[in-house]
Amino acid sequence: MATKSTSKPLLLSFLMMSYLISTFHVITVAEGRTLQFTKMATDHSGAGNLMDCWNAGLELKSCTDEIVKFFLSQTGTSEPPVKGGIDKDCCGAIGLVVKDCWSVMFTSLGLTTMEGNNLREYCEFQAEKSELSPSPAPETLALSPVEITYPGLDY
């Protein structure tokens, strides 16, 4: 059996090693949690704040008629959708959801990710189309000639 004088340093070194191992474990777990949190933030893209995303979701809900008509008008070909299509407000909400919020929000409307991508592509195409189309010429105002006479002045 070990003497009393050798058991103290042995006990002290055992406690010191236990402390170091537990500290290392806590640091590793804390760093792992930070990395996991960062990964979750990048999955969400993080640029949109909660209120913007919430408002975009509400806008999407109010656009369901337009979205349903859009998908019903698609026949799997390159034919244009029904006249009117999806308006700028709905396209703005779709763009915000795809780029800055959770694209999973489309599932709240019963849409798949592929359908969400189709909506995004349509809205991007409409935005490009409106940028490329020339703006209408301003209307000119045609005035009829008026004869002005001044009393007392004869020419």
From Swiss-Prot:
Residues 1-32 form the signal peptide. One of its GO terms (biological process) is double fertilization forming a zygote and endosperm. It comes from the Eukaryota. Keywords: Cytoplasmic vesicle, Fertilization, Secreted, Signal. GO terms for cellular component: cytoplasmic vesicle; extracellular region; vesicle. The keyword Manganese does not apply. Restricted to female reproductive tissues, specifically accumulating in storage vesicles of the unfertilized egg cell. The keyword Signal applies. It is found in: Cytoplasmic vesicle; Secreted. Pfam families: Prolamin_like (PF05617). Belongs to the plant egg cell-secreted peptide family. Involved in the regulation of gamete interactions during the double fertilization and to prevent multiple-pollen tube attraction; mediates the redistribution of the gamete fusogen HAP2/GCS1 to the cell surface after secretion upon sperm arrival. This is Egg cell-secreted protein 1.5.
